[in-house]
UniProtKB/Swiss-Prot annotation:
Pfam families for this protein: GnRH
Lineage top rank: taxon: Eukaryota
Family: Belongs to the GnRH family.
Tissues expressing the protein: Expressed in only one cell group in the mesencephalon.
Protein name: Progonadoliberin-2
Organism: Haplochromis burtoni
Length: 85
């Protein structure tokens, strides 16, 4: 009997604690999953230098990445972003 009351009390405490906690915070303009409302960006001006870098013709040298793992992760992220466009 004591074990069942303890289990019930712990379950109730868990439910109340989950409702009262602020486990997830969404910043203004962001939605769950990291999505952002596209209309909030408006028409942004992109400089010519950025356009050239996207085409692969950067006017400046990029610093070399030190870590191979970081390089692989950044390249994979860049490919995923290109797929979504």
């Amino acid at each position: 009997m004591c074990v069942s009351r303890l289990a019930l009390l712990l379950g109730l405490l868990l439910c109340v604690g989950a409702q009262l906690s602020f486990a997830q915070h969404w910043s203004h303009g962001w939605y769950p999953g990291g999505k952002r409302e596209l209309d909030s960006f408006g028409t942004s001006e992109i400089s010519e230098e950025i356009k050239l870098c996207e085409a692969g013709e950067c006017s400046y040298l990029r610093p070399q990445r030190r870590s191979i793992l970081r390089n692989i992760l950044l390249d994979a992220l860049a490919r995923e972003l290109q797929k979504r466009k």
